[in-house]
């Protein structure tokens, strides 16, 4: 099993360079899935504990690697401050050895601390990297914890977890509307919608598909299909 977690253009080894050894290749990106003939999975979120703060100390947070988008993210932060909002953006280098190459780079932060700050924010920023069209882990974190999402990824509207009260597309809406958006209550997702984005659901579907293959070999009825993934 091989899973591309980022856009394929960021990987040295492309799908057509992988030996035909019976591996299944998966991606979170629908465009990459179609382009390279890979299996598409909507999400593999691992459910964890935690609860968002009732008294957040910042409006929008972002903790992530540069990936060629740092200048745009920091510029967005300045625009938010000009609107009277309180963003907290920390950019890390793509590799640790690059830490001192740019003055705004911050040391790597443990994921536990990132999640803690995300839960103490009114919203989290998800900024597209080059070649990305699928949703990211940040999107799924927000949906799981009920933290609002600010993003420039228009593809989010194609997903059934999208709700305009939960997701602010800042390239489609004026930034001046962000403050009022943050005041609107988060709309909780239906459990049957959310579960499709969890790793437990994906594993269950793989097992079901394997059982169906065994049944076909035995000449038994196929049962339900897992093609909806």
Regions found by a protein language model. Name each.
Residues 1-81:
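Catalytic core of nucleotide-activated saccharide and alditol-phosphate transferases
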Residues 10-15, 46-50, 109-113, 137, ...:
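A generic local structural motif
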Residues 16-19, 53-61, 100-105, 180-187:
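Short, surface-exposed amphipathic charged segments that create phosphate/polyanion-binding patches used
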Residues 26-34, 91-96, 152-157:
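Short, polar loop motifs at secondary-structure junctions
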Residues 71, 75-112, 154:
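Catalytic donor nucleotide-activated moiety binding site of glycosyltransferases and closely related
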Residues 100-104, 111-209:
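Catalytic binding pocket for nucleotide-activated donors in carbohydrate/polymer assembly enzymes
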Residues 211-229:
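Non-catalytic N-terminal targeting/anchoring module and adjacent flexible stem/linker
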């Amino acid at each position: 099993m091989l899973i591309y977690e980022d856009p394929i253009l960021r990987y040295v080894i492309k799908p057509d360079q992988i030996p035909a050894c019976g591996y299944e290749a998966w991606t979170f990106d629908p465009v990459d899935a179609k382009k390279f003939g890979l299996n598409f999975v909507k999400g593999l979120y691992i459910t964890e504990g935690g609860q968002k703060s009732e008294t957040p100390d910042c409006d929008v947070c972002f903790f992530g690697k540069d990936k060629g988008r740092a200048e745009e993210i920091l510029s967005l932060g300045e625009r938010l401050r000009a609107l009277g909002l309180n963003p907290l953006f920390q950019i890390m280098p793509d590799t640790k050895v690059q830490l001192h190459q740019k003055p705004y780079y911050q040391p790597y932060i443990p994921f536990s601390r990132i999640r803690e700050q995300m839960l103490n924010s009114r919203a989290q920023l998800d900024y597209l990297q080059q070649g990305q069209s699928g949703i990211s882990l940040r999107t799924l974190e927000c949906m799981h914890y009920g933290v609002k999402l600010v993003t420039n990824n228009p593809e989010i509207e194609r997903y059934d977890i999208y709700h305009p009260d939960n997701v602010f597309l800042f390239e489609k809406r004026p930034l001046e509307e962000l403050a009022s958006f943050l005041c609107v209550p988060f709309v909780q997702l239906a459990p049957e919608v959310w579960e499709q984005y969890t790793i437990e659901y994906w594993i269950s579907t793989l097992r079901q598909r394997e059982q169906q293959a065994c049944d076909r070999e035995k000449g038994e009825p196929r049962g339900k299909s897992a093609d909806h993934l």
